[in-house]
Amino acid sequence: EFETLNTQANNAFKGVDRSVQLYDFSGSNPIEYRSMWEVQKSLVGAHVNRLKVEFQKIAPDTQFMDTDQLQLGASSSSVVGISDYMMIPEQEERIKSFDSLILLQHQPVYTLGTGSDSQFVKLDEERLESLGIDLIRIDRGGEVTYHGPGQLTAYPIFDQRGYKQDIHWYMRALEEAILIALENAGVQGAVREDNVTGVWMNGKKVAALGVKVKRWVTMHGLAVNVDHRSLGNFDGIVPCGLEGRDVGCVNDFLD
């Protein structure tokens, strides 16, 4: 549960409902990674514009992103419709927060964090192409991971000024959210492990985390391996750079 703090840094949010706008594409076709990365950056940009309004007194009609900025082209038709959910000026009175949560499945892709070591990718470029798996270096923390069908990926675009300005707290809160969701789904035995991020079951990693924070606005997030489809391409990498550690999926642990 995210706790709103009443600190001096959060004075601008006193009396403001911290509502979250949900974009749920988890039941749709898997989405190409780069397209949704651009959407994340657009949502973060909208947050930054809002902060300029609140703290620099910029005219209010500049705080809302033009929905045309989210038109991603014909090659990205799998995300057509997300602009319909974007905030526009006439929605100003109804929207209390720019916090957003995107749920989706991705097309097969390996992502490397900013400082990730490419030695943890076992496949060469030719093999990746034959398998139809993209390899992308992105702007999050953490080592290499895999996204694909059968995996629930969540991208919280949250302004931490409305919660707690502590990245370690945020990472633990994401883990806690996964643990609570699994428990509510009847999945028993999910735990944290000391000195490593993520959620584990019977020694296998079922959920991974990797985030970026810009001006205390978060992007990227978490991925939960739900069914066996999510596991097929992990053998092409050393997941999260953890040698000798296995990955698993939630369905293996359902009663």
Model region roles, listed by residue range:
Residues 189-192, 220, 231-236:
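Short conserved catalytic/interaction loops centered on acidic-Pro-aromatic/His motifs
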Residues 1-200, 205-206:
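N-terminal lobe of the biotin/lipoate ligase/transferase fold
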Residues 205-213:
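Glycine-rich, charged/polar anion/phosphate-binding loops
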Residues 110-111, 119, 216, 231-233:
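Short, acidic Gly/Pro/Ser/Thr-rich loop/turn segments
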Residues 214-232:
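Conserved phosphate/anionic-ligand binding catalytic regions in large, soluble enzymes, centered on
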Residues 231-255:
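A hydrophobic, small-residue-rich beta->alpha segment in the mid-to-C-terminal subdomain
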Residues 106-107, 114, 213, 226-228:
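Residues immediately flanking
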